[in-house]
Amino acid sequence: MARVTVQDAVEKIGNRFDLVLVAARRARQLQTGGKDPLVAEENDKVTVIALREVEEGLINGKILDVRERQEQQEQEAAEMQAVSAIAESRR
């Protein structure tokens, strides 16, 4: 298990407050969102995995925003398609 130094992750994000927000969002995605880790799990907790992803430059706030927007657009498109199918079946 590689040790994560917060200082390395802070340098990637810019400041420790944004690091906390980004790492928490990513850890929540890993825990509940069914997302796959971008680094080897190595029996680490999701918070450590999130910090390692940040440290390696694989995750940052902009990347998370883009991915969430894409997923939201895909979900909205699927919902609109389902609504259209229901409307067509009632005609």
Swiss-Prot record:
Reactions it catalyzes = RNA(n) + a ribonucleoside 5'-triphosphate = RNA(n+1) + diphosphate
What this protein is called in its record is: DNA-directed RNA polymerase subunit omega
One GO cellular component term: DNA-directed RNA polymerase complex
HAMAP family per the record?
RNApol_bact_RpoZ
Q: Which Pfam families match?
A: RNA_pol_Rpb6
One GO MF term on file is: DNA binding
State the Gene3D superfamilies in the record: 3.90.940.10
Which protein family is named in the record?
Answer: Belongs to the RNA polymerase subunit omega family.
Q: What is its EC number?
A: 2.7.7.6
Does the record carry Transferase as a key word? Answer: yes
Instruction: Name the gene that codes for it.
Output: rpoZ
Q: Which GO terms describe its biological process?
A: DNA-templated transcription
